[in-house]
């Protein structure tokens, strides 16, 4: 976010950094055909956790800078790659910590605040006249950071939700691989129900949109579970396939 806001400067008047096409020369500025288009700024959860995890004041400060720099839309990452969330829901745990670079150190930043992270952004965006969107890492269920965090590490009853990968050694759960982000199997019906419930809770906020990042299978090696094989066989009209 700091890089995106480098255009901001002091003063209370909003400045149009987007309409001048003169390039700084002596020519008269001409109307920029893109001046009226939306301009988005993406607020990554981990990278901005040191500033925003426990400070509504910092959120207000940086959204004011974004408005002054000419941005029209804020996208807030509320489900990072651990699979836990930064909005109100009963279906998965809240994010309690993230790792971020502070100076030259990769540091664990804990969230001790109890106020609603997403709601703080919504409230401030409305004050600033900005549109507000939420983004989630859709099919991520955990991350190997800090010895393993997220639903797939906490709840062994959800082991079948983890994507199965076609490795040289055979079909293997993503939990037993070096993949840092532990993906769900998008084809699993219980995974779909779980995520739909999350999205219902997310949609209850006063949002202008929801971004579904990582709304996909992990990679070409996934998914090779029995569940996916059966669904694919049914889709192909009953043709039997050997994994």
Residue ranges and their predicted role:
Residues 5-35:
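Bacterial Sec-dependent N-terminal signal peptides
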Residues 32-56, 137-205:
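Active-site-adjacent "subsite" loops/lids of carbohydrate-active enzymes
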Residues 39-43, 74-76, 132-134, 210-213:
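Hydrophobic faces of well-ordered beta-strands that scaffold small-molecule active sites
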Residues 51-69, 98-128, 193:
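Aromatic- and glycine-enriched glycan-recognition loops and surfaces
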Residues 57-84, 205-209:
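Catalytic domains of carbohydrate-active enzymes, especially glycoside hydrolases
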Residues 66, 74, 125, 195, ...:
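Conserved, mostly hydrophobic/aromatic
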Residues 71-113:
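Aromatic-lined carbohydrate-binding/catalytic grooves of carbohydrate-active enzymes
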Residues 86-99, 140-175, 215-243:
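Aromatic- and acidic-residue-enriched segments that line the glycan-binding/catalytic groove
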């Amino acid at each position: 976010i700091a890089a995106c806001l480098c255009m901001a400067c002091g003063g209370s008047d909003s400045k149009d950094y987007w309409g001048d096409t003169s390039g700084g020369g002596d020519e008269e500025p001409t109307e920029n055909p893109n001046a009226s288009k939306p301009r988005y700024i993406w607020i990554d959860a981990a990278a901005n956790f040191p500033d925003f995890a426990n400070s509504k004041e910092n959120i207000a400060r940086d959204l004011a800078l974004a408005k002054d720099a000419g941005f029209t839309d804020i996208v807030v990452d509320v489900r990072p790659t651990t699979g836990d969330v930064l909005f109100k829901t009963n279906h998965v745990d809240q994010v309690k910590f993230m790792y971020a670079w502070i100076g030259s150190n990769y540091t664990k930043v804990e969230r001790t605040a109890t106020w609603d992270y997403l709601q703080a952004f919504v409230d401030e965006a409305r004050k600033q006249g900005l549109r507000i969107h939420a983004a989630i890492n859709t099919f991520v269920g955990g991350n190997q950071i800090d010895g393993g965090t997220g639903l797939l590490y906490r709840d062994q009853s959800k082991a079948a939700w983890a994507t199965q990968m076609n490795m040289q050694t055979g079909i293997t759960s993503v939990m037993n691989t070096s993949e840092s982000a532990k993906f769900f199997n998008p084809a699993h019906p219980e995974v779909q129900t779980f995520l739909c419930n999350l999205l219902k809770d997310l949609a209850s906020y006063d949002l202008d949109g929801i971004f579904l990042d990582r709304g996909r299978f992990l990679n070409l090696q996934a998914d090779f579970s029995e569940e996916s094989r059966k669904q694919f066989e049914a889709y192909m009209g009953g043709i039997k396939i050997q994994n």
